[in-house]
């Protein structure tokens, strides 16, 4: 465990083993959400995270699950912000000044580039890549790269999937699923039916699951 100078830790906050938190970060302070009235809420941080200079992470609110959760092995670069009630998975990278608003979910291995902004309640699927200064207003299915303001889908994160051990066949299936969803002019229900016909490979199931769990609608 490493805490550099001028780190502020409020609470209740639970921090796991092997974390490194750099100077001027504020961890577990009250949320500025106007609904928050001082109720007991908490922040949970897993193991082996690197939290760089000036990062802010707020606790949850009773209007949600009263918890903000950060998984393990994440890298939050300088001045990144994690709002109240967020759930950040494992192995996530938030580049300098990336910011996620309240109630956001970020899946494992996702990357948020510098100055990316994520609207409240948005879900970012696993292995997504969000481009620099993108504004994400709707949910992003697994494996997708998204750029722009508002963020629009570009392709699948091939390089990221290779690094994570997905086979060439699985990456091809993910690309086929992406094209059915975004490049064939199909309605969403039609695209889901067509993707289902690609089989039950875990990559396809993961892609479908991230679509079906969407509550804000997916980027289109």
Region annotations inferred by a language model:
Residues 2, 18, 24, 35, ...:
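Terminal amphipathic alpha-helical/low-complexity segments used for targeting or macromolecular assembly
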């Amino acid at each position: 465990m490493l805490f550099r100078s001028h780190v502020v830790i409020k609470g209740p906050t639970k921090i796991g083993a092997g974390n490194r938190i750099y100077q001027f970060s504020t961890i577990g302070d009250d949320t500025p959400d106007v609904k928050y009235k001082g109720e007991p809420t908490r922040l949970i941080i897993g193991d082996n995270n690197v939290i760089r200079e000036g990062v802010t992470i707020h606790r949850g609110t009773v209007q949600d699950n009263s918890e903000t959760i950060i998984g393990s092995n994440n890298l939050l670069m300088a001045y990144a912000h994690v709002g109240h009630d967020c759930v950040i998975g494992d192995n996530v990278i938030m580049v300098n000044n990336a910011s996620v608003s309240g109630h956001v979910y970020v899946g494992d291995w996702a990357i948020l580039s510098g100055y990316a902004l994520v609207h409240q309640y948005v879900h970012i699927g696993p292995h997504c890549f969000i481009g620099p200064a993108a504004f994400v207003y709707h949910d992003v299915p697994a494996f997708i790269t998204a750029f722009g303001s508002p963020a629009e889908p570009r392709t699948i994160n091939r390089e990221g999937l290779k690094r994570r051990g997905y086979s060439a066949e699985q990456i091809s299936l993910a690309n086929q699923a992406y094209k059915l969803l975004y490049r064939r002019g199909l309605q969403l229900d039609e695209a889901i039916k067509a993707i289902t016909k690609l089989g039950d490979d875990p990559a396809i199931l993961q892609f479908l699951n991230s679509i079906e769990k969407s509550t804000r609608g997916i980027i289109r």
